[in-house]
């Protein structure tokens, strides 16, 4: 018997890119035996997003008149249903939607001389994860991406367009090295 997975989002369609540039070789590390970049691509497909190549001309993305989902392969286990929820929120609000995680580390302010000052309230802080979903109107209003660093991109977009954040589940966390990949692998073991 053939098993068919349901497409989670297929309203009017959306395009998606796995943004691997500027991330070194880490997108090709293995999690559960698969490259992080492959895991990210599968999540886009399962969310009903049509994947396009990072090299697709920006003008073609504008002409498509569809939302654009940017997915970071360093958040490889972001669930498809979360990506679909971000696309749905983008369609409902016409705002840029950014996946975020709470900051759990203790943060300290440092003065100009490098002297540690006060503890920063981490409740007000969020770590940008994945995805970032751009409504078609925002895609049309840009000449391209200002950055492929998601934190920088989110800040740039927030300065120019309405932005809504959605809290990503724990498995949507960002990895920064092979040790983080092992932690994520343990977190998502089935």
Predicted regions and their residues:
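Short phosphate-binding loop-to-helix
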Residues: 45-69, 76, 82-88
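N-terminal membrane-targeting/anchoring modules of bacterial envelope and secretion proteins
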Residues: 1-4, 26, 61-62, 146, ...
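Flexible, charged surface loops at secondary-structure boundaries
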Residues: 7-13, 61-64, 90-93, 158-160, ...
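Glycine-rich "substrate-gating" loop/helix at the edge of Rossmann-like oxidoreductase active sites
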Residues: 74, 170-173
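Conserved core of the sugar-phosphate nucleotidyltransferase
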Residues: 77-168
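Hydrophobic helical membrane-anchoring modules
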Residues: 175-190
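N-terminal glycine-rich phosphate-binding loop and ensuing alpha1 helix
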Residues: 1-56
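Residue-level signal for inorganic ion chemistry
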Residues: 37, 71-72, 102, 135, ...
């Amino acid at each position: 018997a053939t098993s068919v997975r349901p497409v989670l989002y297929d309203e009017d369609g959306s395009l998606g890119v796995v943004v691997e540039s500027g991330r070194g070789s880490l997108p090709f590390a293995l999690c559960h035996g698969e490259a992080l970049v492959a895991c990210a691509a599968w999540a886009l497909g399962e969310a009903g997003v049509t994947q396009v190549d990072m090299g697709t001309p920006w003008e073609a993305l504008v002409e498509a008149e569809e939302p654009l989902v940017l997915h970071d392969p360093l958040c490889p286990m972001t669930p498809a249903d979360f990506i679909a929820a971000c696309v749905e929120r983008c369609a409902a609000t016409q705002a840029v939607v950014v996946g975020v995680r709470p900051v759990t580390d203790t943060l300290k302010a440092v003065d100009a001389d490098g002297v540690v000052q006060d503890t920063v309230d981490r409740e007000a802080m969020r770590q940008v994860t994945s995805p970032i979903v751009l409504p078609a109107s925002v895609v049309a209003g840009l000449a391209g991406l200002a950055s492929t660093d998601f934190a920088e991109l989110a800040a740039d977009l927030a300065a120019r367009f309405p932005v809504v954040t959605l809290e990503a589940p724990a498995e949507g966390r960002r990895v920064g090295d092979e040790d983080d990949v092992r932690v994520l692998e343990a977190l998502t073991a089935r």
